[in-house]
Amino acid sequence: MPAPRYKSGSAKKVYKRAPGNRRVLHIRRKKQSSAKCGACGALLNGVPSLRTVQVSKLSKTQRRPERAFGGALCPKCVKKMMVVKARNY
């Protein structure tokens, strides 16, 4: 019987071959999906695709780019938004 923490559907199940030609179930954590732009859905560069615990151990500059809306919007959307805001100001 697996431990309760391994019975989750979010755990990735991998079968490995052990000595004696046995198949053994190994349970791994799934990979985190990449960060996406909030406006257009494009993949964000400079943002690591790690789990929350691992991201919290990184320094602040390694977590997201140091520009306006870094880690939330892609550069194209930021540029568009700034142009629109400047024209409406």
Curated annotation (Swiss-Prot):
One of its GO terms (cellular component) is ribosome. One of its GO terms (biological process) is translation. NCBIfam families: PRK04059.1. This is Large ribosomal subunit protein eL34. It comes from Methanococcus vannielii (strain ATCC 35089 / DSM 1224 / JCM 13029 / OCM 148 / SB). InterPro entries: Ribosomal_eL34, Ribosomal_eL34_C_sf, Ribosomal_L34e_arc-type. GO terms for molecular function: structural constituent of ribosome. Transmembrane segments: none annotated. Belongs to the eukaryotic ribosomal protein eL34 family. It comes from the Archaea. Pfam families: Ribosomal_L34e. Keywords: Ribonucleoprotein, Ribosomal protein. The keyword Transcription does not apply.
